[in-house]
Amino acid sequence: MAQNDSQEFAELWEKNLIIQPPGGGSCWDIINDEEYLPGSFDPNFFENVLEEQPQPSTLPPTSTVPETSDYPGDHGFRLRFPQSGTAKSVTCTYSPDLNKLFCQLAKTCPVQMVVDVAPPQGSVVRATAIYKKSEHVAEVVRRCPHHERTPDGDNLAPAGHLIRVEGNQRANYREDNITLRHSVFVPYEAPQLGAEWTTVLLNYMCNSSCMGGMNRRPILTIITLETQEGQLLGRRSFEVRVCACPGRDRKTEESNFKKDQETKTMAKTTTGTKRSLVKESSSATLRPEGSKKAKGSSSDEEIFTLQVRGRERYEILKKLNDSLELSDVVPASDAEKYRQKFMTKNKKENRESSEPKQGKKLMVKDEGRSDSD
């Protein structure tokens, strides 16, 4: 049987199934011969392929350290949070003073997105978590090993991702090929009729105090509005703390924040007062002696008003002011004569008051002692 097969193969080989071109040319000549090509074949097909140059990627380069500053962009992108108090029963609350979100593990956190101008069709909203402090910002924020092994039920998101999107089946979870950072994005949806914002529900799947995870290191959540190709249209960020009692922690941190602000304000006021006093003392020290005004004279014509509490003080200050006004009017020579006359009159009155009346002799202490002796 095998021998018959080999004979048939040899006969086929001898017949040479490859079509030989007329004239004994090469088989490649058939390709160049238009007789053997279909009528729809484009002879410039390969030239067009070679002339096409590779186009650069429209995706922006990935940054090792993501930017956290607010960027509303041309569309006026910004965030809002529902108002909530500091009661112990709240599961999610936002502090405008701190720009910080306090929430419980795996609880719903509504984030409202507002734009002034609608973004292009197909735009997406992305949420990324990074560490706030510079010494930790290069590390990837991920769940602790304990919560990572805990089944979540839906299995839609990778186990290591901290941020989840609730109630949206179109959420896409990504891990960057270069930085390995985790992010989740959803298609941007225009606000519903009568509403000004679009709401996205976020879940944080690990506590801030978990060992092996965030380990009490503060984190930021960056919300970006991007085109379908990854071009940035807007960016906002806020701090997040995942804890057991969000209301209590918010109240405590806001109280500490206000105390720090008051301390800084008092320190600035004290520093400014000290600087002004030092400046005045230095200017007084550097002032030449010749610039000092002579006592008893005043060439300043500016008038001031002084408010005094109490009639007695007013009379004293009035007499003092009248004396100063009189000294400015009376010449110095006449003032000296009046002063001498006043002193002489006072001495005479003192001498008369010291003499005893009705001829009685004033007993001196030493004289009385000598008589007794």
UniProtKB/Swiss-Prot annotation:
Binds 1 zinc ion per subunit. Residues 345-366 are annotated as: Basic (repression of DNA-binding). Residues 301-332 are annotated as: Oligomerization. Changing residue 168 to K: Loss of transactivation activity. Temperature-sensitive suppression of irradiation-induced apoptosis. No effect on embryonic development. Residues 250-265, 346-373 have a biased composition (Basic and acidic residues). InterPro entries: p53-like_TF_DNA-bd_sf, p53/RUNT-type_TF_DNA-bd_sf, p53_DNA-bd, p53_tetramer_sf, p53_tetrameristn, p53_tumour_suppressor. Residues 52-69 have a biased composition (Low complexity). It comes from the Eukaryota. Pfam families: P53, P53_tetramer. It is found in: Cytoplasm; Nucleus. One of its GO terms (biological process) is response to methylmercury. One of its GO terms (cellular component) is nucleus. Residues 52-80, 250-301, 329-373 are annotated as: Disordered. GO terms for molecular function: DNA-binding transcription factor activity; DNA-binding transcription factor activity, RNA polymerase II-specific; metal ion binding; molecular condensate scaffold activity; promoter-specific chromatin binding; RNA polymerase II cis-regulatory region sequence-specific DNA binding; sequence-specific DNA binding. Residues 1-31 are annotated as: Transcription activation (acidic). A motif (Bipartite nuclear localization signal) lies at residues 274-296. Its cofactor is Zn(2+). Residues 70-260 bind DNA. Belongs to the p53 family. This is Cellular tumor antigen p53. It comes from Danio rerio (Zebrafish).
